[in-house]
Curated annotation (Swiss-Prot):
Family as reported in the entry's similarity comment: Belongs to the purine/pyrimidine phosphoribosyltransferase family.
Gene label: apt
Organism of derivation: Roseiflexus sp. (strain RS-1)
Entry keyword set: Cytoplasm, Glycosyltransferase, Purine salvage, Transferase
Catalysis performed (reactions): AMP + diphosphate = 5-phospho-alpha-D-ribose 1-diphosphate + adenine
Keyword Transmembrane helix attributed: no
Protein name in UniProt: Adenine phosphoribosyltransferase
Amino acid sequence: MTTNLADLIRNIPDFPIPGIQFKDITPLLQNGAAFKEVIDTLAARYEGRALDAIVGIESRGFIFSAPLAYRLGVGMIPIRKPGKLPWETFAVEYDLEYGTNKLEMHRDALAPGARVVVIDDVLATGGTVAAACQMVEMAGAVVEEVAFLIELTFLKGRERLAKYPFFSMIQY
């Protein structure tokens, strides 16, 4: 990599709640060369693989999944918060430190046997991505890899996703 991407991630203490060190990716996104480098790195990793789609998780996962899907010439499948998709959906509830949340994906988004990469911006505990992967598998599709811009290693999300091939660009 030509840019130190980690230098473009801003740390925001006590956001959104006290005790959280939020990783703000907006400086990286504002830097055209750095954003291009992220997409180019991901595209180089997945070019030539027999992929059918890139799955992006609302909302910041969309920032990376859409241009990557475009570059690879494959579909982009959005996984969204409840009530945002207009058609029949799979839904998976998952645990957070302070409660539960739910994600949805259109039932017809992926054909059985489709091969996908699931992308999100930050890996923390892994609950969100595990739920996304569960929906991909409910559709009969195959998770070829999970990928992240940032991995918060101290939260051990990678362990929760141990059954999937894994890639992260920046580790804290």
